[in-house]
Amino acid sequence: VIVPAKLKDSIPQMEEMGLTVLAVKPENQAGLFGAIELLAQATNTTARGEELEMAIDSNLAALAEAVAGTDAPSVYLAGNSSVLETAGPAMYQNTMIENANGTNAAASVEDTYWAEVSYEQILDWNPDYIILASDAEYDVDSVLNDAALADCTAVKERHVYQLPHAVEAVDSPVPASFLGSVYLASVLHPEQVTEEYYHAAA
């Protein structure tokens, strides 16, 4: 059984039930690689794990080169349930924003999970872009038409997008999450990271 490290208090109970438990904390790139290595060792697939890490590393290195020297716009990454939820620096989504050469508008948030914020706070941050989570229960139009956000730069410029979700949530700490970084970079830096670039990476 694989559980997030934040649920470590429940591990002894699971082990008492005869379960083998692996705890992971993939909330940044190093943590994600650590989780891949742990699972590869546990499943005796170390070589495949190394190949996967190398592929992710290669894609992220190419992305970093593509966006090098560009300005880093501010990004508000909205959560699954509401536009009034966001990811702070303790979450993997922050790494994804940084990989795309963006700046997390919610960098001051201290929560280690999705943080609830107010409309006033979003307007105070005034992000250049609002990005909806892959599995958001609302859509881009609902944000663009939200009167409470009418004065936000991202809304005025119609810089509101949703991360892809055709196969899995690429804004989650999973191996395919590098595609979330590439997609986000294609939104923030379309001249450097074209739609063709994104589809080639995918």
Language-model segments: residues:
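Short helix-capping and hinge/turn segments at secondary-structure transitions, especially at repeat
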Residues: 61, 98-105, 127-135
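Active-site phosphate/pyrophosphate- and oxyanion-stabilizing loops and adjacent acidic/basic residues
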Residues: 37, 94-95, 120, 182
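Short, conserved, surface-exposed binding loops centered on an aromatic residue
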Residues: 66-70, 96-98, 120-124, 152
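Extracytoplasmic substrate-binding proteins
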Residues: 9-85, 106-107, 162-202
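Long, aromatic- and glycine/proline-rich binding clefts that accommodate carbohydrate-like moieties
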Residues: 147-166
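Alpha-helical, coiled-coil/dimerization segments enriched in small aliphatic residues
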Residues: 86-114, 118
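Short, well-ordered secondary-structure micro-motifs
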Residues: 86-89, 141-143, 173
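Acidic/His-rich segments in extracytoplasmic proteins that coordinate ligands and/or metal ions
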Residues: 1-42, 46, 113-153
